[in-house]
């Protein structure tokens, strides 16, 4: 029973594949592609700009930079004290 049902489906799929793309699905010509490139690049640039700005704002609003700065200051102070006690 499955073989009887799958053969017509296979034939229809094979016919669709061999038919090729429909006219609406055909590739656009080169001139329209070249004309659309600047618009797409501008859209891409603005999208990247917004994502970058959002990321920078999140970093500035977080306390990560302050914690990192404090950690480095503490570590530097400990190393400095260790050098002073070792070499004095």
Swiss-Prot record:
It holds the Pfam family ApoC-I. The keyword Cell inner membrane does not apply. GO terms for molecular function: fatty acid binding; phospholipase inhibitor activity. InterPro entries: ApoC-1_sf, ApoC-I. Keywords: Lipid transport, Secreted, Signal, Transport, VLDL. GO terms for cellular component: high-density lipoprotein particle; very-low-density lipoprotein particle. GO terms for biological process: lipid transport; lipoprotein metabolic process; negative regulation of cholesterol transport; negative regulation of lipid catabolic process; negative regulation of very-low-density lipoprotein particle clearance; triglyceride metabolic process; very-low-density lipoprotein particle clearance. It is found in: Secreted. Residues 1-26 form the signal peptide. Belongs to the apolipoprotein C1 family. This is Apolipoprotein C-I.
